[in-house]
């Protein structure tokens, strides 16, 4: 890690936000503390922005793997484990899973309505499923749909087709035929977003890929594929944000699938009221809800430059381009629990190989650096890369991230003191 300290990179006051009152002070953020160690690699057990701490903040959910620089194949397991923060970071293995990747791990979530209980994706009896596990008793419940997002109350999930995703975006899909990928169907009318009741196990197809064909980028390649990915509920679980993509020339791309075209959408939780977030050419990449109506999304502003945007659902034409140029990169944006700050980490540039990380004060768009983290050559492969993928603890007193700056893929925490 490059120790940049808390150097103000930019202070950009919008005319509408200037006033005589003092802005909210930036918090003090500690240096990173490793809570896992080699020789094996470790990462948070879920995608960025997802809470990894138990209700009492004692345990942190992680994955452990022997694989370093390639995608996992069908039948190659990672260990789901808990780090005990009150017992010298003791690692407690609790399960195995063969549906995982280095980006979203196994999409593990703690369930707030059940004590000592987590869910994660796995392959059981040849099918991709969700496993609900009480890690202390070992009791399991199987939901026959893998999760892509879970509501804040833990009662609902969105499910997508991870077998199709393995073909169209390998670093986010799962190996094996645990779902019907429908490889020869460009616009499936029987697949898309599934709303899953995590208590009953019942699911309903709320939005099909085919239903959005006229609003997505069209394909000339007869072997192209359209698909949905990257879903997230708003805090009250009344709306869903998701990305819809088309991808062509799959057979010619033996090393990297990169020619996808993205359209960002929101819809109500029943699949109605579908809204495009941006005009043609803007795409969309990373995202998070600030509240029930406000989203941050990294997108290609005015089809010119990738940057961070904020907008209100229903008022998409009033979208703001924030950061005065400093935030013109594709970052993993997430909001602090108090809603006053936004964290975002980006990708390294050629010949530099350091991942930047910044904290934005939303009231005046002042920005400070949280450091720059070196990426060794072994972790520069697209499919096995190590993004920082931060996430706040629910009380805002810690932020965690994955990193390879000390030579191997490990999990780190930073303490936060709010002023």
Q: Where are each of the predicted segments found?
A:
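Surface-exposed loop and turn segments in beta-propeller and other repeat-based domains
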Residues: 33-43, 93-102, 201-224, 368-382
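Beta-strand-rich domains and repeat architectures in extracellular enzymes and scaffolds
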Residues: 33-78
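Blade-loop segments of beta-propeller domains
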Residues: 47-49, 67, 73-123
């Amino acid at each position: 890690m490059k120790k940049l300290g808390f150097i103000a990179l930019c202070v950009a006051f919008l005319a509408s936000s200037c006033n005589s009152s003092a802005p909210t002070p930036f918090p003090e953020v500690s240096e990173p503390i490793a809570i896992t160690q080699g020789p094996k690699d470790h990462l948070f057990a879920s995608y960025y922005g997802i809470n990894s701490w138990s209700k009492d903040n004692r345990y942190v959910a992680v994955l452990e793997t022997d694989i370093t620089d390639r995608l996992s194949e069908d039948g190659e397991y990672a260990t789901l484990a808990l780090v005990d923060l009150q017992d010298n970071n003791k690692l407690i293995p609790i399960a195995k899973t063969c549906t995982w990747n280095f980006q979203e791990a196994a999409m593990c979530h703690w369930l707030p309505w059940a004590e000592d209980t987590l869910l994660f994706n796995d392959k059981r009896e040849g099918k991709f499923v969700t496993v609900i596990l009480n890690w202390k008793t070992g009791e399991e419940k199987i939901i026959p749909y893998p999760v892509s997002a879970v509501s804040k109350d833990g009662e609902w999930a969105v499910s997508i087709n991870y077998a199709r995703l393995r073909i169209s975006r390998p670093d986010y899909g799962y190996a094996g035929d645990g779902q019907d990928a429908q490889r020869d169907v460009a616009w499936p009318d029987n697949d898309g977003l599934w709303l899953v009741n995590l208590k009953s196990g019942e699911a309903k197809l709320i939005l099909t890929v085919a239903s959005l064909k006229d609003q997505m980028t069209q394909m000339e390649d007869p072997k192209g594929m359209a698909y949905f990915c990257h879903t997230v509920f708003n805090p009250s679980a009344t709306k869903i944000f998701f990305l819809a993509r088309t991808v062509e020339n799959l057979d010619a791309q033996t090393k990297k699938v990169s020619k996808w075209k993205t359209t960002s959408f929101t819809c109500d939780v029943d699949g109605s009221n579908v809204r495009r977030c941006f005009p043609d050419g803007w795409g969309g990449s990373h995202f998070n809800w600030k509240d029930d109506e406000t989203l941050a999304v990294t997108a290609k502003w005015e089809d010119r430059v990738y940057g961070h945007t904020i907008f209100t659902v229903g008022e998409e034409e009033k979208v703001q381009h924030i950061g005065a140029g400093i935030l013109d990169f594709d970052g993993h944006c997430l909001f602090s629990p108090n809603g006053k700050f936004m964290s975002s980490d980006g990708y390294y540039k050629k010949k530099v190989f350091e991942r930047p990380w910044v904290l934005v004060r939303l009231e005046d768009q002042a920005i400070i650096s949280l450091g720059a983290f070196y990426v060794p050559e072994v972790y520069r492969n697209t499919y096995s890369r190590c993004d920082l993928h931060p996430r706040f603890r629910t009380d805002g007193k810690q932020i965690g991230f994955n990193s390879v700056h000390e030579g191997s893929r490990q999990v780190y925490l930073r303490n936060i003191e709010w002023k």
